[in-house]
Amino acid sequence: MAVEEAMTVLEPRPLSYFVETDEIKRLAERALAYIKAGFPVHFRGVSGTGKTTLAMHVASNVGRPVVMIHGDEEFSSSDLIGGESGYRIKKVVDNFIHSVLKTEEYMQRQWVDNRLTVACKYGFTLIYDEFTRSRPEANNTLLSVLQERMLDLPASRQGGESYLRVDPNFSAIFTSNPEEYAGVYRSQDALRDRMITLDLDHFDRETEIAILEKKSGLSPKNSTWIIDIVRGLRESGKCEYAPTIRGPIMIGKTLKIRGAKVSKKDPIFRETVLEILTSETSRIGSRGHQVKVKEILNGLIDKYC
């Protein structure tokens, strides 16, 4: 049986949009130290706290090619390791003697190595984004990879090898949302025990201002006003879901497109803030929630702008 590789490899490089404040720098340095010590790192936090971006940043500092996997409920172990994918057919036609036609045909099953196998084989950095969206049984194959540095291989794979020794340069970075999120499975204790978990929360004020300024192109003063509005709403405790840095970025980019000013006197600014932050902080669209949040936001806009 022939063996092919599903090569989807990213070349790590510094992210042009990445904002590195002192808080983020310290966190990235700790994560990189754990990886260099031989341990996988797990960034856990609510949506919008920069887990995937931070994972990509740390991977770029590791300096090895990156293989990325996005967790999926439909995954099985073959989606990580590999499996049979069609056949390879070879046909030889021999007509050397004009009056004689000789044909030989070979059919061979083809095995394709998937991303985990490729990363283990060549010592790439694996980023497994939202790994708890995959079923726990699909992730069982990671246990031996992270602990014994061995990847168990199916008997149907060519070569007769029952396992693959993981390259010493292999490293792994995981991200996940809290377990109470919809579509998230509880990860196995045995898997969590094999990784170092770093819990991420909302960034500090300085970092949020820097991120908004970088990603939206707004001035430092305007970025500060918008972040203060968002942080005020977050600290009010009146939201179903606390607003993240994604809301201010949406606001900033929309204001740029519409040519609006960050001012309480600009109706476009007020309308944009109310719509985006009301949407971000609610999942069920409750009328009562919308009225309450808009009342808080109007007060914050008048206070800061």
Locate each region found by the language model.
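C-terminal regulatory/interaction module of P-loop NTP-utilizing enzymes
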Residues: 1-305
